[in-house]
C-alpha cells in the first residue's frame, strides 16, 4: 500500500541541523523580541492612589506631606517613602513633587530669605514659583512634577508624579 520512503544520511543530517539551528536562532531572538515589545505589553492601568491628608487640613500655603507606597520590583516588594508639597489654589488642589528637575535634590518652600514665597533648591540655587514653574535664569530647565490626585470621602489621594501638563 505505502511504499518505503528511504531518506539518505545526508538528508537526515541536513534536516536535523536545520531544525537545531532554527531552534537556537529562535531562542536567541526571543529575548530581543520580548524586550522590544515590552512597553507595548505593559498594563497602562492607573497606579494605586495613596491616602495622604484630609482636605480640611489644606491651606493656601504649601505644606509638605510624607507618605509611603508599596513598590514591587520583580519578586522584591518594598515600601518607598515619598513626599509632596500640597496646597489649595482657589478651588483647585495642587500637589507638587519636591524633586528638583535640575539634579534631583529636594526643594523646600520659602526657605531662601532672598526669594520669599518660592520653592528653593539649596544644592544649586534653583527656584520655582508657587505653582511649580521654574524661574528663568536658574539651573532647573523644567517645572516641578505634579502628582495624579483624587479626592474621595474628604481625603486627598495621590498617585504617580508626572511632568506638568502630562496626564
UniProtKB/Swiss-Prot annotation:
Protein's recorded name: Menaquinol:cytochrome c reductase iron-sulfur subunit
Top-level taxon in the UniProt lineage: Bacteria
UniProt source species: Bacillus subtilis (strain 168)
Biological function: Component of the menaquinol:cytochrome c reductase complex. The Rieske protein is a high potential 2Fe-2S protein.
Quaternary context: The main subunits of the menaquinol:cytochrome c complex are a Rieske-type iron-sulfur protein (QcrA), a cytochrome b (QcrB) and a cytochrome c (QcrC).
Stated family: Belongs to the Rieske iron-sulfur protein family.
Chain ranges of the Rieske domain: 59-158
Textual note on the cofactor: Binds 1 [2Fe-2S] cluster per subunit.
Key word Metal-binding present: yes
Binding site for [2Fe-2S] cluster: 100, 102, 121, 124
Classification via PROSITE patterns: RIESKE, TAT
Gene: qcrA
Amino acid at each position: 500500500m505505502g511504499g518505503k520512503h528511504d531518506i539518505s544520511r545526508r538528508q537526515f543530517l541536513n534536516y536535523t541541523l536545520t531544525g537545531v539551528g532554527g531552534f537556537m536562532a529562535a531562542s536567541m531572538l526571543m529575548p530581543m523580541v520580548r524586550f522590544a515589545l515590552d512597553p507595548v505589553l505593559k498594563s497602562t492601568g492607573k497606579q494605586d492612589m495613596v491616602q495622604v491628608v484630609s482636605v480640611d487640613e489644606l491651606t493656601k500655603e504649601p505644606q509638605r506631606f510624607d507618605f509611603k507606597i508599596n513598590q514591587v520590583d520583580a519578586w522584591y516588594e518594598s515600601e518607598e517613602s515619598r513626599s509632596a508639597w500640597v496646597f489649595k489654589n482657589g478651588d483647585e488642589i495642587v500637589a507638587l513633587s519636591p524633586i528638583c528637575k535640575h539634579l534631583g535634590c529636594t526643594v523646600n518652600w520659602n526657605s531662601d530669605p532672598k526669594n520669599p514665597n518660592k520653592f528653593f533648591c539649596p544644592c544649586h540655587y534653583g527656584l520655582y514659583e508657587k505653582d511649580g514653574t521654574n524661574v528663568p535664569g536658574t539651573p532647573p530647565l523644567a517645572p516641578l512634577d505634579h502628582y495624579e490626585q483624587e479626592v474621595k470621602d474628604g481625603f486627598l489621594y495621590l498617585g504617580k508624579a508626572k511632568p506638568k501638563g502630562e496626564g
